[in-house]
Every structure is written in C-alpha cells, then in structure tokens.
C-alpha cells in the first residue's frame, strides 16, 4: 500500500497518465529491467502455485516481491521521480512502477480481493473507462519469458546479500552508516560489474569495494 501511495502522490503532482506512454524495454535502466524480470517470474510462479493449490507458497512469494519492490526498487529509484522535467528516465520509472503495481494486483487479487480492487479502480479504471469494471473480471496476467533475466536476478540477489551482510558488520562493529568506510572486501570468485559495485558502495557508504577469492591475508 505504501508503494501505491508513493506512486499516486507523484503521479498526481506530475499529472502522469499511463495511457499516454508505452513501456519501451530497450530504453529501461538496469533497475527497471530487474523489476520487470522479477515481476514476470512472480506471475509465472504464482500461476503455477495456484494451479497446484499451493496457497501458502503463493502468499510467501507475493510478500517477498512486495518487500523487494518497496524496500529496494522504490528506494533506489525514488530520486528519479523527484526530477522536475518529465525526462525519458522519469517516464521509464513511472511506467515500470505502474506496470508492476497493476500486474501485482491482478496476480494477488484472489488472495487480497478488496485492497487490489481499490488500487485497480484508481490506477486503471480512473484513466481507462473501457477497462473491465472490476479487477476480478480481468484475465490473470500472463508472464513474458523474454523479460525474465535470471542472470540479472541472481546478480541483484548477490548485491542484496552483500548489502545485508555489510549492514550486519557495521552493526557488530557499532559503526553507523553515515560514517564512511575506506575499503570493503567481498569474498567471491568473480567480481560484479561496476553498476552493482556502485550500488553496494552507495548503500553501505564505502569508498571502494574489492572482490577477492583469497582471504588468507585477513
């Protein structure tokens, strides 16, 4: 609900209308592509789970997706919504988040019928009167295998693991996140790309992150 409220707040300020834009995959940032990959993986998993009556597993994957959507994608992307001009990057952020919210609601509607209906009425019916009158009259979303990038998902998962461990190390050493650290070593056979390293450095307030498979010196 907080992510939905975030979207509505800035969409109202910018008078953003999703029907006036299309989601152009080739123009998206890595974060956008990651979210769309996770979204399509979610739809695929939920569809399979519901077909096999795995209700608990369905609730768990929906909860995990909402957590990553709110606490990772939105938090890492919110500055894009603060830009005054309606740049292509800002449009991409709006369209990616809009697509995620609407698709998530359709996938979660059997589990959360009233909240998803409320969100659907505002995000979809409010701007498209030709859309089905209720979210429960919509087709269940279909996943697009071409948008699922497991390598991207795995790399971002590694980033999330490193950030969580880094925060735990800071807490153990009683070093607040606002205090910068000169160097952080990560034990791994291969280094991540600079894009991911930049995220780690920003999240943990570290000047430099170095990947090494040899930790004998430490």
Segments predicted by a language model, with ranges:
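Feature 926 captures the class I aminoacyl-tRNA synthetase adenylation module centered on the KMSKS loop
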Residues: 1-218
């Amino acid at each position: 609900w907080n992510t939905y409220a975030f979207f509505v707040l800035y969409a109202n300020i910018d008078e953003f209308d999703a029907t006036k834009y299309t989601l152009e995959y080739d123009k998206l940032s890595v974060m956008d592509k990651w979210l769309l990959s996770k979204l399509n993986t979610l739809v695929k998993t939920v569809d399979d789970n519901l077909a096999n009556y795995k209700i608990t597993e369905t609730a768990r994957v929906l909860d995990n997706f909402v957590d990553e959507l709110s606490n990772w994608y939105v938090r890492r992307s919110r500055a894009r919504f603060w830009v005054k001009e309606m740049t292509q990057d800002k449009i991409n952020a709006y369209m990616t988040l809009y697509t995620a919210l609407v698709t998530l609601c359709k996938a979660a509607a059997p589990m959360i019928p009233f909240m998803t209906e409320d969100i659907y009425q505002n995000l979809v019916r409010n701007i498209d009167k030709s859309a089905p009158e209720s979210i429960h009259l919509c087709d269940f979303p279909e996943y697009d295998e071409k948008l699922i990038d497991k390598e991207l998902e795995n790399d971002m998962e590694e980033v999330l693991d490193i950030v969580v461990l880094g925060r735990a190390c800071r807490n153990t050493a009683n070093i607040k996140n606002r205090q910068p650290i000169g160097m952080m070593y990560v034990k791994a056979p291969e280094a991540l790309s600079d894009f991911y390293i930049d995220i780690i450095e920003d999240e943990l307030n570290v000047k430099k992150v170095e990947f090494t498979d040899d930790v004998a010196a430490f």
